Amino acid sequence: MDEKITSRENAKIKYACRLSSSAAFRRSEGRFLAEGRKLCPELARGAQLENLFYTESAMAKCPELAGLPGEHYLVEDHVADKLADVGTHQGVFGVFRTPVHTLDEVKAGGRYLALERVQDPGNVGTLLRSAAAFGFDGVILSDGCASVYAPKTLRASMGAAVRIPVIEAGAMPDAITQLRAKGITCLAAALYKSQPLSAAQASCPGGVCVVIGSEGQGLTDETIAACSSTVRIPMTDRVESLNAGIAGSILLWHFREESL
């Protein structure tokens, strides 16, 4: 029988809560907390599940949770309330090991998405999901991006955070330099002095990296200068711009895997 946790002050519960609330703690521990009856099993397909916390009612609704790996703990409802990031939850939580990937894994001829200082968790999650859907080989994040493993980002990505390699690369211009050294064309998404998509698509025989900037400021001048060229999405004058999640997803679709 699984161990039952009745106290909100239990050490495992306090540890899991800290993973949920602190990006620095997630990085130092190499772990993250996720919640949801669908999300936890989905994440377990691509990341190591160490601890599963569930309420009695959650297991009754989703008995297949019993087949997941890791240590399982039955928690009382008030304990689950402490673990939850939002007021209404499904009573299922998992502590996972964070997958680790580096720029050394980037392959010539691959398709990549790079995000520079994209701070909205919803946009980061949406772009991870789009990159996975359109057959991209990895996502590269600069310093200052929203945490991939924060609760809101995980919900938005719907498990894509472990279905596609995520590389935390630090300074984006340096990452772009490494990508270009492998023959990858790096396209900076920019509103001005940019080539149209049709021209950009014809110029990427050796792989492509779509580079998206922050919601408010866009890409830094240094990153734009490091890229091969700039690209824009054709639009009417009825709107000034699109948010990072929408613009990035459109670009990812244009450079999707050829078999799709």
Enumerate the predicted regions with their spans:
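Short, aromatic/basic amphipathic alpha-helical patches
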Residues: 60-69, 223
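Glycine/small-residue-rich loop that forms an oxyanion/phosphate-binding "nest" at active or ligand-binding sites
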Residues: 68-97
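RNA substrate-binding interface of SAM-dependent RNA methyltransferases
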Residues: 100, 105-194
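Active-site/ligand-binding-proximal alpha/beta "capping" segment
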Residues: 187-239
